[in-house]
Amino acid sequence: MRVFVAVEITDNTVLNSIEKIQTELKISGKPIEIHNMHFTLMFLGEVEEELIKRVQVQLQTLEFSAFDISFVGVGAFPKPKFPRIIWLGVEQGKEKLIQLAKNVEERLVPLGFSSDKPFSPHMTIFRIKNYAGDITDQISKYSGVGFGAQRVSSIKLKQSILTPKGPIYSDIVVINAK
């Protein structure tokens, strides 16, 4: 089963802002579906059912307080001249989100999991497969723009089923803030 640990985006103001940007940007890429918006705190990959149970137990030992995050600015990975990912940035709550991702990893390292790169708080809103051209001008107008805020009060272990129409996510377990 393909799984990951995530913080879901559920605030309607944020989701409406994302939908608006996805419509405004003229990019030959695939917009992420609004109901799939999330931060991937840690991608675990293909995991056997027995190990998933152990992952759940480890995640349920996690203690964190609820906190707020705010979304500001639009950027691109690896860079706006050759974009592959278009993202929203995080301002308020960035450090807490980074710490939460570290805490998740610390819980899961004993089970053999590790991140291949440090967690960088961003919300993917587009994926681009083929060269889309330089989008610097398109995204620069959003550099200081706020897109709303949300309270982070839970994380989820989620299953991802890949289909030709896009991924289908389902919750395996929800861990609420203490």
Residue spans for each PLM region:
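Histidine-dependent nucleotide/RNA phosphoesterase domain, centered on the 2H-phosphoesterase fold
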Residues: M1-K178
